[in-house]
Amino acid sequence: MGSGGVGGLYGGRLASAGCDVTFVARGAHLAAMREHGLLIENATLGDTLVKPVKVTDDPASAGTPDLILFAVKLWDTEAVAKLLKPIAGPHTAVLSLQNGVVKDDILGGIFGASALMGGVAYVGTHISRPGVINQVGTLQRLVFGEYDGKKSARSEQLLAALLKAGIQAELSTDIRRTLWEKYTFLVGLSGTTASMRTTIGPVRENPQTRAFLHDLMKEAVAVGRALGVALPEDYADDRLKFADGVPATMDSSLHHDLKNGNRLEVEWLAGGVVRLGQKVGVATPCNRAVWDVLVLASHF
């Protein structure tokens, strides 16, 4: 559900490997996929065309799925989940590839906690034009797992399908921590690149912006730890070192959306840190600043 950069990439890889995948799309993207198929462009791996492709704008026409890959924008989570609820069977699994750490709380309230597996996607993609997903680099990693930390028949089955499709998939025994590990870096990357209108390179080189990057992540770690997530106290230091090793041109989807005049997910990124921090009594002034600066672009 959601055939943009993330959903289109993972769904396309699975479909190309022979899995029975139905894409849900709308507008020009839907029309292009119906006429031309789904094209995944990658300068390194080569292009992949999925044609014919099963695509619809009516989820009910897809029947009862074994798995719902949930990849819509965060503000659509509740409405889309309620739309999909009638087609979910008693054994339908739900795996969200969205950003943030509160998505599964929303989904669990609609599908039931037992339906959920937690997931984290590591990939650089966007829709370059209708029917076409552009993938940057070779990274297409997906870490997922059951919330009880145990292996299950459905997680093992999905792992096998993902690996067959060439996706760098792995099972996590502490998916909540895995979600917060990605969230910590994403909060820093998105908050700095979008608010400063630049890529990670200049951010990490300037002492003031480097400190701001670190503090954004430090606040996220403090909130996560207060919520009981098993993050090391110095995890922000680790993520800052990680930031030093990524390409200077690395950017965030939040900044990409800002440049293109799209609605922003800042309410669930920096804003999420602020709201969760308020619940557990952790001050988050840097994330509050990012949220305040970008809030007008987050509401259309």
Residue ranges and their predicted role:
Residues 47-132:
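Rossmann-like NAD(P)(H) cofactor-binding subdomain of soluble oxidoreductases
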Residues 12, 16, 82-86, 109, ...:
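Short, well-ordered alpha-helices that flank and scaffold nucleotide-derived cofactor binding pockets
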Residues 32, 86-87, 110-119, 128-233:
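Internal alpha-helical scaffold of NAD(P)-dependent oxidoreductase catalytic cores
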Residues 38-55, 186:
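N-terminal glycine-rich dinucleotide-binding loop that anchors FAD/FMN and/or NAD(P) in oxidoreductases
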Residues 1-45:
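NAD(P)+-binding Rossmann beta1-loop-alpha1 motif at the extreme N-terminus of oxidoreductases
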Residues 163, 214-300:
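NAD(P)-dependent Rossmann-like dehydrogenase/reductase catalytic/cofactor-binding core
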